[in-house]
Each structure stands twice: as C-alpha cells, then as structure tokens.
UniProtKB/Swiss-Prot annotation:
This is Large ribosomal subunit protein bL28. It comes from the Bacteria. The gene is rpmB. SUPFAM superfamilies: L28p-like. GO terms for molecular function: structural constituent of ribosome. GO terms for biological process: translation. Pfam families: Ribosomal_L28.
Length: 62
C-alpha cells in the first residue's frame, strides 16, 4: 500500500534545499499520514489518512 492519503490524495512531493550560496540538493516533503481503521462496505480496513483529513472530519473511524 502506497503512503498516499485515502481521502485527500496527499503524497510525498520533491523540492530543493537551498544554501546561502544558492546551491541546491534534492529533498522530499512528506505529509503527516496516520494509519486509521475505517469501514469500507461494512468491513474494517486499515488506510493511510492525512492529519488534515482527520482534523476536518472527513474520516469516520471505528
């Protein structure tokens, strides 16, 4: 299972670190994903959910 939010689709994105000399190195920015159990078709299923989805009430936990 990929680390992608089941509800919002948030996933890891890439960017750059910049030094004072403006040198660049690649970096990744990861979302705050939590593993939660939800009901899908009446059965419990463990999925990744972003903290934003949890706080906004998009997730109905069991």
């Amino acid at each position: 299972m990929a680390k992608v939010c089941y509800f919002t689709g948030r996933k890891t994105v890439s960017g750059n670190n910049r030094s004072h000399a403006m040198n660049q190195t690649k970096r990744t920015v990861k979302p705050n994903l939590q593993k939660v159990t939800i009901l899908v078709d009446g059965k419990p299923k463990k999925v990744w959910a972003s903290a934003r989805a949890l706080k906004s009430g998009k997730v109905e936990r069991i």
